[in-house]
Amino acid sequence: MALRAAVFDLDGVLALPSITTSWARAEEKLALPRGFLNEAFKKGGQDGSVARVMTGEITFSQWVPFMEEDCRKCAEDSGIRLPENFSVKHIFDKALSEKKINYPMLQAALTLKKKGFSTCILTNNWLDDSAQRGSRAQLMCELRPHFDFLIESCRVGMAKPDPQIYKLMLDTLKAEPNEVVFLDDVGTHLKPVRDLGMATILVRDTDTALRELEKVTGVQLLQTPALPPTSCDPSALSHGYVLIKPGVRLHFVEMGSGPAVCLCHGFPESWFSWRYQIPALAQAGFRVLAVDMKGYGESSAPPEIEEYSLEVLCKDMVTFLNKLGLSQAVFIGHDWGGVLVWNMALFYPERVRAVASLNTPFMPSNPNVSPMEIIKANPVFDYQLYFQEPGVAEAELEQNLDRTFKNFFRAHDETFLTTNRVRELGGLFVGTPEEPSLSRLVTEEDIQFYVQQFKKSGFRGPLNWYRNMERNWQWGCKGSGRKILIPALMVTAENDLVLHPKMSKHMENWIPHLKRGHIKDCGHWTQIDKPAELNRILIEWLETDARNPLVDSKL
């Protein structure tokens, strides 16, 4: 029978360095004999303190004194003296603080899952009440979404190598033994697995283990292209609603803890456009709030054009922060969301911890030139003139939502659309296929999510963002001459045909602390076109420029 399930140990397999490697480093530093800590650990035995901590009978902090005593006994038996600064707690704290995800092994698990394998983490673990418990919690939060099942010894009251925990694993997977491969870095944990009839791999180093895993599964795992970042399942997220004023609410999804990061999408999109960024930013230690902007999805879509002026939209976002009790947030925007976040930084700098825009440059209002003059002078913006007459573009875009989104969400080398001569042609989709093919950027499920969202909201609200050019210009002129002095990031996309990188050329004149990121071979839909590259740029910038300073209560 073919293998259809893969089970991974945590320590020494999915997370490195292994505890034994950390012990060896501690032994060297403390001038203890090699293997000393492992011998002391074994003294706890399957019937002693180790079994009690691994099965959740006692916590880590309760177990530490037992390990201290076992170390003292081992030292006496070996005729050595423990250093004065010897501390089991410090050794384990250090080991946990150093532990990182073994990404090649994780990618192998993801590849197998994509090929139809069920995946499971089976780990001997303790109830962690130590000073480093946050590190362990973060590690588990990062790994858990990638696996179908997680079995922790301290949660089920049994631990490896007890055969009962492997039988529980088989029941959980609903698999026969000969359908499962199990990877562990401890040989004694594998013997009962083999006795039950499962395939086993003893992990000494990652490359060798992956070669063995390739061989037994028949799936290529080495030298494979990196898988895209994890996407969001809308049904598995926390959804929230903030009442901005009577009749107007903003919907958002939320993930993570830490400094708040508010994600603002563009046209014609949804919070779902950030589906590859939300988990990555949350795992990096941020509280992510991805908003359905006004007019979209489950947020309110009032019909009045003036409801979508930048002045009103920014006031809405300030109310959004107030209602959530947030004094500041990092604002990251794309397309129209980029315009919004630059204006938040310009008019409400005290509420913006840092600001970043994808594709959309900061373009200060010129009191001497109206925006309509600029748009009319640039043929690539003709579509915006087509959007001005209420009801016209709505009729075209709402006629066949499946066609609409398959036309919009395309890579730069797949596009059917032209943004110039739209009025002359009589519409944005004139000359495009009635049944467009699916772009490589999206799945059919992605398209249907947008279809369902716009069945709720329609296109009037989203198009009203374009119908406030004069109001936005007049408001923007009130900030004429101001500079944006807060931490800022501009991410350009090489192949965005409308928001071309050259448009951001002079931004440093207005934003002296501006940092930049540039993504090659990327079109307009940056978040889904190059999600891994974007996530790397955003996380590096957030870590250096956007961590919240300590705030003292004023009460």
UniProtKB/Swiss-Prot annotation:
GO biological process, one term: phospholipid dephosphorylation
CDD domains (alphabetical): HAD_sEH-N_like
Residue ranges of domain AB hydrolase-1 in the record: 259-531
Modified residues (N6-acetyllysine): 43, 191, 215
Pfam entry (one): Abhydrolase_1
Main location: cytoplasm
Listed GO CC annotations: peroxisome
Positions of modified residues (Phosphoserine): 370
Cofactor names: Mg(2+)
Binding, phosphate: 123-124
Modification comment: The covalent modification of cysteine by 15-deoxy-Delta12,14-prostaglandin-J2 is autocatalytic and reversible. It may occur as an alternative to other cysteine modifications, such as S-nitrosylation and S-palmitoylation.
Keywords: Acetylation, Aromatic hydrocarbons catabolism, Cytoplasm, Detoxification, Hydrolase, Lipid metabolism, Lipoprotein, Magnesium, Metal-binding, Multifunctional enzyme, Peroxisome, Phosphoprotein
Matching SUPFAM superfamilies: alpha/beta-Hydrolases, HAD-like
UniProt KW Cytoplasm keyword: yes
Cellular compartments annotated: Cytoplasm; Peroxisome
Catalytic residues (UniProt): 335 (nucleophile), 466 (proton donor), 524 (proton acceptor)
Family to which this protein belongs: Belongs to the AB hydrolase superfamily. Epoxide hydrolase family.
Family annotation (NCBIfam families): HAD-1A3-hyp, HAD-SF-IA-v3
Oligomeric and partner information: Homodimer.
Function according to Swiss-Prot or TrEMBL: Bifunctional enzyme. The C-terminal domain has epoxide hydrolase activity and acts on epoxides (alkene oxides, oxiranes) and arene oxides. Plays a role in xenobiotic metabolism by degrading potentially toxic epoxides. Also determines steady-state levels of physiological mediators. The N-terminal domain has lipid phosphatase activity, with the highest activity towards threo-9,10-phosphonooxy-hydroxy-octadecanoic acid, followed by erythro-9,10-phosphonooxy-hydroxy-octadecanoic acid, 12-phosphonooxy-octadec-9Z-enoic acid and 12-phosphonooxy-octadec-9E-enoic acid.
PANTHER family in UniProt: EPOXIDE HYDROLASE
The name this protein goes by in its record: Bifunctional epoxide hydrolase 2
Gene: EPHX2
